[in-house]
Swiss-Prot record:
Protein name: Translation initiation factor IF-2
Sequence segments annotated as region (Disordered): 101-406
The UniProt record lists the keyword Protein biosynthesis: yes
Gene name of the encoded protein: infB
Family: Belongs to the TRAFAC class translation factor GTPase superfamily. Classic translation factor GTPase family. IF-2 subfamily.
NCBIfam families from the UniProt entry: IF-2, small_GTP
Organism: Bordetella pertussis (strain Tohama I / ATCC BAA-589 / NCTC 13251)
Amino acid sequence: MSSNTVAQFATELKMPANVLLEQLRAAGVDLKSVDDAVTDSDKAKLLESLRRAHGATEGKKITLTRRQTSEIRQADATGRSRTIQVEVRKKRVFVKRDPAELAAEQAAARAEEAAAEAVPAEAAPAPAEPVRAEPAVETAAKPVEPPVAEAPAEPVAAPAAEPQPEQPAQAEAQPEPTPAAQAEPEPQPEPQPEAAPAQAVAEPVEPAKNVSVTETEAEQARPEPVVHAQTELTSQTPTPVAQPSAPAESPKSVKAEPAAAPKTTAKPGEIRRAAAPAAPDRAREEARRAAEAEAAALREMLSRPRKVLRAPEPEPQAGALSGTLHKPAGKPATTAAPKKDAKPGAPGAKKTIKTAEVSSTWSDDSARKKPADNKPAVATRDGWRAGGKGGRGGRNSRNQHQDRRHEQVQQEFIAREIHVPETISVADLAHKMSVKAAEVIKQLMKLGQMVTINQVLDQETAMIVVQEFGHTAIAAKLDDPEAFLDETAAVTEAEAEPRAPVVTVMGHVDHGKTSLLDYIRRAKVASGEAGGITQHIGAYHVETGRGVVTFLDTPGHEAFTAMRARGAKATDIVILVVAADDGVMPQTREAIHHAKAGGVPLVVAVNKIDKPEANPERVKQELVAEEVVPEEYGGDVPFVPVSAKTGAGIDDLLENVLLQAEILELKAPIEAPAKGLVIEARLDKGRGPVATILVQSGTLKRGDVVLAGASFGRVRAMLDENGKQIQTAGPSIPVEIQGLTEVPAAGDELMVLSDERKAREIALFRQGKFRDVKLARQQAANLESMFDNLGEGTQTLALIVKTDVQGSQEALVSSLTKLSTDEVRVQVVHAAVGGISESDVNLAIASNAVVIGFNVRAEQSAKKLAETNGIDLRYYNIIYDAVDEVKAAMSGMLAPEKREEVIGLVEVREVYTISRIGTVAGCMVLDGVVRRDSQVRLLRNNVVQWTGHLDSLRRFKDDVKEVKSGFDCGLTLRGNNDLQLGDQLEVFEIKEIARTL
């Protein structure tokens, strides 16, 4: 028995403990304080007390429910047989009689019995007497019930033999009243709590008992009615009385007990004498009215339709009908006995059979059901199953079978929710709606679409079709296998342990980031980079006196914005390197924005303090303007002056970095599947796809199945930043892994999966998704550019870019695409990691593109193919050079700019008109020079009158090419004779000037 204290119980109930203690004391539980223990019996007493206090009574109804599940097989729309689950639910409610009402009825019954004893002995054996003594019969049923429950197979009339030895002489003289009178004193007038189930059973039994009484009254005019009734009732007794679901059979068995006792001793003449009516007319009328009312109520209850889903039953065989229901062959005795003894025309017999059979018990129901057959249930027009071989109309069974074969199966329409994916075929859509594909095609034809069964429909069309069929259409996405990753991440939880900080060095180009990192690593990396600038993101881990620190070195050039953003995303602390002689530059500002967007703390390293022109104070002022406030100004950003050449301030810088790391309390699980970030990726000629990974949590082991973006694979080899083979890598350790199927994109998340098949599935899904998005973007770009280029002569410079690593490819493509203008557009046809191959050259031939190799070279076969077809191959190892040359090539493709240049001024001094030539002007060159092919502008009073070309230029009678200032000449204008004295001619030329970007 569970127990707890009053205080704990009050906490569970969310109420004050002292109030609960008062209620327990009021309920009769002797408790002193809130620390006393409360048992389950105390809780029951409290509940009973509270119910009485609130006027609640015990439950008066008992509801019994039962479920039965069966299966039927039925053909669906496609002709395939499928199994349908059929569930039958039954409910029975039993009402408990009020004890006060029962006591009142028993008292009234005893008074009537006392009055009946005063009647002469001849009138005593009247069969109507039990009607007036209903409560006595009910109470007599209570002690009879336990022996019946112990031996349910015996007839119920057997226990009635117990009172016979006590008064055998009275049994001969008075057959019926003797057992009834003996049964009276046995039950207690106040029912005990144990008797409650018997009362509950007796209550619904009462109407059936009255019905049987009216039946006996109806048979009083017949010669031997009581004998028939006795045999009929005893034939019904094999059903156990103790079952609560047999409300109509138990009273008959109880009533049969007093009648069965005299059956062995009394003579037939005495039984006939007992059938004579002797009770007063008034009592009989009241009994008849009450019995008829209750019989009507019972008939109404039994005739009420039950809402039960049942498999269709086969038609009953001829000759197997009894009463109104078909009884199975397993229980023939219950229906055969009344037919032998009872007369066919006796109304009492009919009613008894109906009452006994309709008041179904659960055992009868289960026996009545036939086992489900494997054949599909074929429905006919009226909704009933067709008869079998032995059914009615056996002669026409062949015709019925043919009709059934041609008859369409009528199924009730069920509105479903149909999940429609982005694309679905007509056949699949029909299967989802459980209709034939021809119906869907017919519906689409009505909508104006001619389709075939395998044609793929888009989501919108499919949803319209679903709605036309009356179903509810729900737009559904394809199954996303990436949901598996969320489940995996939720399951794998391990204890977090301290890890090393990841520090990213950021800043403007040439401010000394890599040199600073070199001094920390005691290695020379900057000199190895082409042009002395960092073009790759480097990852190193350094062991200092205070622990391990992982450094990420990002490029400072503007082209590497995405790389810097990735560095800030993967990092814990950012070291912002600013040159003391240069100050804050554009990439410095960008690095500040990246750090703030990632919520990463900053440590400013003011570099190059060893230079004479260094001005650290100016750097501080400029950084304050960028909202980076040093600690000495009241901010939270440490400023450390350092020199990458002399090593001054390096220890202070590391001290500040590790101090920030301690404040952050960096932790990560170690004993867990690894997760990380792809820092850099490239295609190595001998090793295949190689990716630089920063492990962020867990432990990466050799042989693990990894998923990185749209690529997957098994880790075949792991190298540290020094090129040494390692077997495992913990959190904050950068490693280079081999074994991926293709080069992942830099910035992709890497994670270890247990199942290679699942990794392949997710990678293929991502590839398809990426391809769809890429095609959609290209299609959108093509449409936009098509309309933009319709009226303009836009030129396109096609490029194929091949680089050594993924990050450089991303940066170079981004820089080249930004060069596009309205007149010349840069189109990167293909960009990838690796050397220049024959396929790249073939693509360049098809698209008339220039191939750019960044830190890579072309294969020998690719070189020959390029020379043969005149394809331009260009190699670069510095990103500046590549961008500048592409810019120059684009400038050469630009249309030249036309400028007008005035070269001379001429004044008209004389005007001559010559018939064959027209108007000739005698002029003086005031300024500059006049050339024959020049254009002129006619000015009159400084207003432009005409613009055109010179037709001829002569000095004296000779044609000349030009006339210089201070000389006179004669000239004619092409297409214009409107010349007057004093007009001026402005001579000019249009020159084409090459444009630059």
